[in-house]
Amino acid sequence: MGKGGNQGEGSTELQAPMPTFRWEEIQKHNLRTDRWLVIDRKVYNVTKWSQRHPGGHRVIGHYSGEDATDAFRAFHLDLDFVGKFLKPLLIGELAPEEPSLDRGKSSQITEDFRALKKTAEDMNLFKTNHLFFFLLLSHIIVMESIAWFILSYFGNGWIPTVITAFVLATSQAQAGWLQHDYGHLSVYKKSIWNHIVHKFVIGHLKGASANWWNHRHFQHHAKPNIFHKDPDIKSLHVFVLGEWQPLEYGKKKLKYLPYNHQHEYFFLIGPPLLIPMYFQYQIIMTMIRRRDWVDLAWAISYYARFFYTYIPFYGILGALVFLNFIRFLESHWFVWVTQMNHIVMEIDLDHYRDWFSSQLAATCNVEQSFFNDWFSGHLNFQIEHHLFPTMPRHNLHKIAPLVKSLCAKHGIEYQEKPLLRALLDIVSSLKKSGELWLDAYLHK
């Protein structure tokens, strides 16, 4: 009988071979209307599904045409569950002769990093100490209570008002670090519980939006300090950052502001205004524009609670001024802490590095101490946090020595500095970029 002789009733039909692709072809599919990415050598067409991605379409788009294996593993807790959403998107796999990684990604560094992550799992460093996070939440609520007590007992004079504002700004800053933990799914094993508590902390305790934060912050983690991909370095022409941007602006004779003085006007419009003006407006408009009624309801619950508590002391207008004074104080704290780890590092176009190398190029650490840990929400361990975003922050210091060893092995710089030095480097970095702009503006 011929080849079809054994294909009859009850026989198993041979499965068609999976299409194979070369990196040269995959890299062409990096447009908003045409997105492919690779995970564990499997090729997925995520063009349409990216619009339904819970983390937003942009974070997927940033990896279009690339291997996204380590980013995929870093951001998701239950890989088997999220893997179910990938199955319908599978269109093929890498050709056998193709390397698993594309472009400038190092296979040896990647292999060592994955071994390091396995070591961290074996050390139970992804296991949460729930008492730690309970105490963090408790001390935030205690500060809220102390603030009300001060005004109730001492009245609304200038001194009690200023003290209360500092207490509430501290509470807001700490709530900001805490929502960051839940937003990164680093507290509970189940994503759903992290999402629920995240909405409570960022919404009811801070008046912000969980979805706005997710869509923005995960882009930053996926492509830190990469122009056109990391929203945290989108400075709206107010600052020029790194080396590439000031040179581009200078050569094109772009002068929206006197950037050679940006290290001076930073003190006037950076720390004071980011939260009370830019973030507060952007968050509210984003929730309304996207019709995110759930997050809006959570935010309204914060404002309702705040004004219900403080209108009796200050009246409507006074309570509004009081709120923005608190935001003003918190904004200084937030800006200095978040910028000390990134703005001083490499800021450039995408070089398509492997996960480990890209995170080390864009992040640095601040020395550990009890105060530094508390003050920064453990973001003094920014390197480890960026490498392992779902690792509970109380374990970051435990993996740090192993990260240092891996850096030393591959000749990658591991930067760690004192807190004051880290803060001063922000200003010196802005000054350096401003000088680069001025030189290019005048002479190129």
From Swiss-Prot:
The chain crosses the membrane at residues 131-151, 158-178, 265-285, 306-326. One of its GO terms (biological process) is long-chain fatty acid biosynthetic process. InterPro entries: Cyt_B5-like_heme/steroid-bd, Cyt_B5-like_heme/steroid_sf, FA_desaturase_dom, Fatty_acid_desaturase. Residues 1-130, 179-264, 327-444 are cytoplasmic. Residues 152-157, 286-305 are lumenal. It catalyses: (9Z,12Z)-octadecadienoyl-CoA + 2 Fe(II)-[cytochrome b5] + O2 + 2 H(+) = (6Z,9Z,12Z)-octadecatrienoyl-CoA + 2 Fe(III)-[cytochrome b5] + 2 H2O; (9Z,12Z,15Z)-octadecatrienoyl-CoA + 2 Fe(II)-[cytochrome b5] + O2 + 2 H(+) = (6Z,9Z,12Z,15Z)-octadecatetraenoyl-CoA + 2 Fe(III)-[cytochrome b5] + 2 H2O; (9Z,12Z,15Z,18Z,21Z)-tetracosapentaenoyl-CoA + 2 Fe(II)-[cytochrome b5] + O2 + 2 H(+) = (6Z,9Z,12Z,15Z,18Z,21Z)-tetracosahexaenoyl-CoA + 2 Fe(III)-[cytochrome b5] + 2 H2O; (11E)-octadecenoyl-CoA + 2 Fe(II)-[cytochrome b5] + O2 + 2 H(+) = (6Z,11E)-octadecadienoyl-CoA + 2 Fe(III)-[cytochrome b5] + 2 H2O. A motif (Histidine box-3) lies at residues 382-386. GO terms for molecular function: acyl-CoA 6-desaturase activity; omega-6 fatty acid desaturase activity; oxidoreductase activity, acting on paired donors, with oxidation of a pair of donors resulting in the reduction of molecular oxygen to two molecules of water; stearoyl-CoA 9-desaturase activity. Induction: Inhibited by a shortage of insulin and an increase of glucagon. Expressed in the liver and brain (at protein level). Highest activity is found in the liver and adrenals followed by the testes and other organs, absent in adipose tissue. Residues 18-95 form the Cytochrome b5 heme-binding domain. It is a multi-pass membrane protein. A motif (Histidine box-1) lies at residues 180-184. Keywords: Electron transport, Endoplasmic reticulum, Fatty acid biosynthesis, Fatty acid metabolism, Lipid biosynthesis, Lipid metabolism, Membrane, Microsome, Oxidoreductase, Transmembrane, Transmembrane helix, Transport. A motif (Histidine box-2) lies at residues 217-221. The protein sequence includes a number of characteristic features of microsomal fatty acid desaturases including the three histidine boxes HXXXH, HXXHH, and QXXHH (these domains may contain the active site and/or be involved in metal ion binding), and the N-terminal cytochrome b5 domain containing the heme-binding motif, HPGG, similar to that of other fatty acid desaturases. PANTHER family: ACYL-COA 6-DESATURASE (PTHR19353:SF12), FATTY ACID DESATURASE 2 (PTHR19353). Belongs to the fatty acid desaturase type 1 family. This is Acyl-CoA 6-desaturase. It comes from Rattus norvegicus (Rat).
